Amino acid sequence: MSILPDIKKIADETAPNLIKSIKIEDIRHWKEINKDNPISQHLDFEEFDHEMTGVSIIAFHYNLDYPILPDGCMSISPYYYFANKYYKHYNPLLQELAVTGRIKILKDTHLKSLANLSGIGFYGKNSIIHNELFGSRFIMIALGIYEEIEWDGLNLVMTDCGSCQLCIDACPTQALNKPYKLDRNQCLRHYMLTGIEVPEIYKSLMTDRLVGCDLCQKVCLKNSKKSQIDRMPDYDQEVFGINRYMEEGGLTLNDLMPPLAEWVGKNYARANRVKEQCNIIYNNIRKGGEQ
């Protein structure tokens, strides 16, 4: 019996989704004849082994709408809330399935390249994958498959953006000055995630954001459809109140990380990174910031 129904069941229990499956043989052949293609250059086969027959890519839909932010609080992109929520559900189930040897959870393979090749979606000029069903509001994972299943053909169309450049114009730091390519050194989200020193000119542009930006996604016409699911919950002021992270005495910063991790996941609730971003947010809130 095919493994796909088991994968589909887990996906359906997690969130509205789209699944595409492509043969490794097809991927290898495409890469061989498209060596100069940027997508080809991102793809490597380090996680693929000789027994693996193909890859299934799952796109889980999420709601990009933000709740109202209470005064004195910092915000997060809904992406991180839903990514953490979905991971908690699907990961233990997929781990059980992986023990059977029928799938492998891929962790380092370039998801955007696989998503485009599989037909999950097209590249936007903001370098994010989108489709007609979910826009760019989805979270992706990839699974290596170890049996023959019903495969999808390769998608050979990179983008459907045409002359639109709304996302490029919306970026406050011009990080999208080259279509389809993100300049990480000018991306607000990149600094939020890494915790490296933020250039002074970018600090006020971060306003109240702890993690995530989404400005380029909010203007994308592909995201104009109403989401199929409810937005993330209202902000918990006990978790997102900025003063809690700035006060000395009482709870330490490490004490505050577990409640925050319930919202954004442990990877993004790291004390050193959060502290750096909180300092910026605190100053922006105090000064009024720049919208």
Predicted regions, residues:
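Acidic, Ser/Thr- and Gly/Pro-rich intrinsically disordered linkers and low-complexity segments
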Residues: 253-269
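Iron-sulfur cluster-binding cysteine motifs and their immediate structural context
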Residues: 166-189, 206-236
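Immediate flanking context of iron-sulfur cluster ligation sites
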Residues: 152-162, 203-213
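Short, Lys/Arg-enriched N-terminal segments with co-localized hydrophobic residues
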Residues: 288-289
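Active-site-proximal loop/short-helix segments
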Residues: 176-199, 233-253
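Core register positions within helices of long alpha-helical scaffolds
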Residues: 277, 281-284
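Auxiliary alpha/beta "docking" domains used to position bulky ligands
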Residues: 1-160
